[in-house]
From Swiss-Prot:
HAMAP family: UPF0178 (MF_00489). Pfam families: DUF188. NCBIfam families: PRK00124.1. It comes from Halalkalibacterium halodurans (strain ATCC BAA-125 / DSM 18197 / FERM 7344 / JCM 9153 / C-125). Belongs to the UPF0178 family. PANTHER family: UPF0178 PROTEIN YAII. This is UPF0178 protein BH1374. It comes from the Bacteria.
C-alpha cells in the first residue's frame, strides 16, 4: 500500500519454507500494491512473481526467523505457522497470521507456546503426540479471507 509520496507504509513478510499459500499471498498483496518478501533457506528453491522478492538465508535452524525478526517493523504483516516467531513479532507491533488463517495475538500466543512446550516434553519422554492436522481447502479459504481483511484494513478500504 502506498501513500501520496509513494513511500511504502507496510510490508508483508512470509516464512516461506513450508508455506502452502504463497500464490494466494502474491495475488492478494498485488491487488493492494503491497510489497511481499518471501524469506526461505537455500534448501528450498522458489520463484515468485515480479512484484515480490525472495530473500535466501542459510539453512540453519532459525535463520529465516532471525531474518524476519530483524527486518520487520511495526505495522508490517507476517505469515508464519511458527508460534515462537509469532510471539516475538507481536512484541514488535506486527500483525501475524498463520497459513490456516488464524490470527495470532497476545491473548492466545502464551497458551499456544505452552501447548507446544508440553508436546516437546512429551516427545522427549517417548510419548506419541499428534502432529498438525491436514491442510484443507477451508484452511486456504479462511487464510485468503483473513489476509484480504488485514490488507483492506491497512489500506483504509
Amino acid at each position: 500500500m502506498k501513500n501520496e509520496d509513494s513511500t511504502q507504509i507496510f510490508e508483508v513478510f512470509v516464512d516461506a519454507d513450508s508455506c502452502p499459500v504463497k500464490d494466494e499471498i502474491e495475488l492478494v498483496a498485488e491487488s493492494y500494491k503491497v510489497k511481499v518478501t518471501f524469506v526461505s533457506s537455500y534448501a528450498h528453491n522458489m520463484t515468485v512473481g515480479p512484484t515480490s522478492k525472495v530473500v535466501m538465508v542459510d539453512a540453519e535452524r532459525e535463520a529465516v526467523d532471525l531474518y524476519i525478526a530483524n527486518h520487520i517493523k511495526k505495522k508490517d504483516v507476517c505469515v508464519t505457522h511458527d508460534y515462537g516467531l509469532a510471539s516475538l513479532l507481536l512484541t514488535k507491533g506486527a500483525t501475524v497470521i498463520s497459513p490456516r488463517g488464524q490470527m495470532f495475538d497476545h491473548t492466545i500466543i502464551d497458551s499456544l507456546l505452552a501447548q507446544r512446550h508440553q508436546s516437546q516434553k512429551d516427545r522427549r519422554a517417548g510419548k506419541k503426540t499428534k502432529g498438525p492436522r491436514a491442510y484443507l481447502k477451508g484452511d486456504r479459504e479462511r487464510f485468503i479471507q483473513q489476509f484480504e481483511k488485514i490488507l483492506s484494513n491497512r489500506a483504509g478500504i
